[in-house]
Amino acid sequence: MSTSASQSTWPAAGPVAEALLDVSTWLIAGASVIFVGVMVLLVLAVQGGPRAVRARLWVLGGGVLFPSVVLSVLFVYSERHQPPWRVAPPKDALIVGVTARMWWWEVRYRDPATGQEIVTANEVHIPTGRPVYFGLSSDDVIHSFWVPALGGKMDAVPGRVQHLQLQADRPGVWRGQCAEYCGAQHARMALHVVAHAPAEFDTWLAAQARPAAPARNGALDRGREAFLAHRCNACHTVRGVSEESRLGPDLTHVGSRLYLGAGTVPNDDARRVAWLSHIQQLKPGARMPSSAERLDPATLQAVADWLGSLQ
């Protein structure tokens, strides 16, 4: 599986992105030709010295006819190649709900076997080779969902559901970003799209539908008990352990995610401890207090280890 940490439109990873890239390429090529032409005329005008010209002919040709033809051609081309961003999904479509919040993403699926809602955060997993339909909304301010390698961006607006269609043609991991300024940590409101082969996606979705695995040993169980004792579950759901709140990201399978804090830091043992201890240094303004002043190092390590075990 290929991995890219960049937010580039090139190379395109799906048909929607390819259509946008084609239009952009033609626009850039056309603009380059016009720029070169203008520079050539400017040089000729400077070197040629004063001479009589038919001003009206230049105005009509260069100021009216030429831009009208260029804009008309580009308009027709772009309209014919406009990707189907807002196509109504068929009955058997994979629909992914994405709710933007300051400053993270809640992601929701439906288990095709049971109809159960499956909730995760900050990572969108999709199968390759088929369109995926996104329902985008926001719980606070206007955000914008954008994964450049897969397609165009779409605003997530409070009180509305916006629809976007994307598709990945090959397995891989692509970074996305909130593309609408939404507050202090806008720059750290990223997401990752993980595209699997269809069979692998079905396996992933089935695993996500299961509740959190029981603690495998006493040390992990101490982490689970500390998580509950210090009321982390007042904001975070861990299915099978506590389902009181969805104020913060669902942590049922947080150990399987690539990053913490909506792409802020990689999800490994050391950074999980650092995230719990000093979140306000890593993501100032996040709606979660740093825990270093409330919990001793051993307790922080136990909670971090337990969260890491939630695969």
List each model region and its residues.
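Hydrophobic single transmembrane helices highlighted by the model
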Residues: L20-G37
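Short, solvent-exposed mixed-charge patches
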Residues: M1-T3, L310-Q311
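Non-transmembrane, membrane-proximal soluble domains of secreted or membrane proteins
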Residues: S2-S24, G48-R246, G261-P284, S290-D305
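Generic alpha-helix structural propensity
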Residues: I28, V38-L41, V64, Y77
